[in-house]
């Protein structure tokens, strides 16, 4: 690869797509992973109506569109729409010619083999990429924290995973997936705010609730005690001004919402919380590496951005682990984008340049080359 051509780094999440150039310290473009199509033909007369809209434009025109998320629970389920998102990423957001830049894509842990092949095929055949690579999201987050061994709790909008990684390689047998993430927390907050007498139901109102969640929610260190405090005083109450000027007050909902990460029963789910899932993941690993995982537990993704989450994880894992074990939870301030940042670091390493799958290799071997070169 020529050094003067910057590689592109594209992290496709269930909720947001993060894209930019290798070597940068933050993504240039962050937009919703949505594709919208007009509900009725010819509604927007003379507006040069497009047959589809992507990202923020789809979001702002949602009143006349049917919105679809092509990535569900971290896995691409609609390739036509996914192709539209990539097209939008290259041509509209980054304004680059994809045939001129190597591209690093990210994938969910345990992504099906056929999916990795399909991603590879689209990059080479549709976008004519000179070279590409597919990396596991959690592994990139670990790199971004300056480690090669540890366990990553990666929680985004559509899915959460606990991924133990040893010397740069994810251990597939010990990866656990939890279908509980940001979108579920937003839904739950909508529900409990309705119980307080506020009504949030439409997609537009859902965006407001997501904003309330991001600005006001936090994780309690001791849930029962926090509930008692909230009941006996108004010290935990905060007010929030809605776009129409109405002011609402939110109390114990602030910590009841993210508490579902630790008690999924709040959402009517029978699964274990994020702390127990992390512990179970560690216990599926060889006894000799557990110590390294406990001491390097890295939080990643937007749903780990709640204040108080690291202290609570520390407390919960300490309670589950052997009493002499040293436990360290690492919560980097930039963890919302650490997958992308890890990709930016990886793709700009001189030692990585031989790892790219080149167009030539693809032409010789076909899509299955991805399993030999990316692991």
Swiss-Prot record:
Query: What InterPro entries would the database entry show?
Result: Actin (IPR004000), Actin/actin-like_CS (IPR020902), Actin_CS (IPR004001), ATPase_NBD (IPR043129)
Q: Which domain of life is it from?
A: Eukaryota
Which Gene3D superfamilies does the record cross-reference, listed alphabetically? 3.30.420.40, Actin, Chain A, domain 4
Q: What class of enzyme is it?
A: hydrolase
What keywords tag this UniProt record?
A: Acetylation, ATP-binding, Cytoplasm, Cytoskeleton, Hydrolase, Nucleotide-binding
- Give GO cellular component annotations, separated by semicolons: cytoplasm; cytoskeleton
List locations, semicolon-separated. Answer: Cytoplasm, Cytoskeleton
Catalysed conversion reaction: ATP + H2O = ADP + phosphate + H(+)
Where is the major localization of this protein? cytoplasm
Q: Which residues carry this modification: N-acetylglutamate?
A: 2
Q: One of this protein's Pfam families, by short name?
A: Actin
Asked whether the keyword Ubl conjugation is assigned, the reply is no
Q: What is its EC number?
A: 3.6.4.-
- N-acetylmethionine: which positions carry it? 1
Query: Which GO terms label this protein's molecular function in UniProt?
Result: ATP binding; hydrolase activity
Q: What does this protein do?
A: Actins are highly conserved proteins that are involved in various types of cell motility and are ubiquitously expressed in all eukaryotic cells.
Q: Which family does it belong to?
A: Belongs to the actin family.
Name of the protein in its database record:
Actin, cytoplasmic
Tell me which species this is from.
Answer: Branchiostoma belcheri
């Amino acid at each position: 690869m020529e050094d003067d051509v910057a590689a592109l780094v594209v992290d496709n999440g269930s909720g947001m797509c993060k894209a930019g150039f290798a070597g940068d310290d933050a993504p240039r473009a962050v937009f919703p992973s949505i594709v919208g199509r007009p509900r009725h033909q010819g509604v927007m007369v003379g507006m040069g109506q497009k047959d589809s809209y992507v990202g923020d434009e789809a979001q702002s025109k949602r009143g006349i569109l049917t919105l679809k998320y092509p990535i569900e629970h971290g896995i691409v389920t609609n390739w036509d729409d996914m192709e539209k998102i990539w097209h939008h990423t290259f041509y509209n957001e980054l304004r680059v010619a994809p045939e001129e830049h190597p591209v690093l894509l990210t994938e969910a842990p345990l992504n099906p083999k056929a999916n990795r092949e399909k991603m590879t095929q689209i990059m080479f055949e549709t976008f004519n990429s000179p070279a590409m690579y597919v990396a596991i999201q959690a592994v990139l987050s670990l790199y971004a924290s300056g480690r090669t061994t540890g366990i990553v709790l990666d929680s985004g909008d559509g899915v959460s995973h606990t991924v133990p990684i040893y010397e740069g390689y994810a251990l597939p047998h010990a990866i656990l997936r939890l279908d509980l993430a940001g979108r579920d927390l937003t839904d739950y907050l909508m529900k409990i705010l309705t119980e307080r007498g506020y009504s949030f139901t439409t997609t537009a109102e859902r965006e407001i609730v997501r904003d309330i969640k991001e600005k006001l929610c936090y994780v309690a260190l001791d849930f029962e005690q926090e509930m008692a405090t909230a009941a006996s005083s108004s010290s935990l109450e905060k007010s929030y001004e809605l776009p129409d000027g109405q002011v609402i007050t939110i109390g114990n909902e602030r910590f009841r919402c993210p508490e579902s990460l630790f008690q999924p029963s709040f959402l009517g789910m029978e699964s274990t919380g994020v702390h127990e899932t992390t512990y179970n993941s560690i216990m599926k690993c060889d006894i000799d590496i557990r110590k390294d995982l406990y001491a390097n537990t890295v939080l990643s993704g937007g749903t780990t951005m709640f204040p108080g989450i690291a202290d609570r994880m520390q407390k919960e894992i300490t309670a589950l682990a052997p009493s002499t074990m040293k436990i360290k939870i690492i919560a980097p301030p930039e963890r919302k984008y650490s997958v992308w940042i890890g990709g930016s670091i990886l793709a700009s390493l001189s030692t990585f340049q031989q790892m790219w799958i080149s167009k030539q290799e693809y032409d010789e071997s076909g899509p299955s080359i991805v399993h030999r070169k990316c692991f």
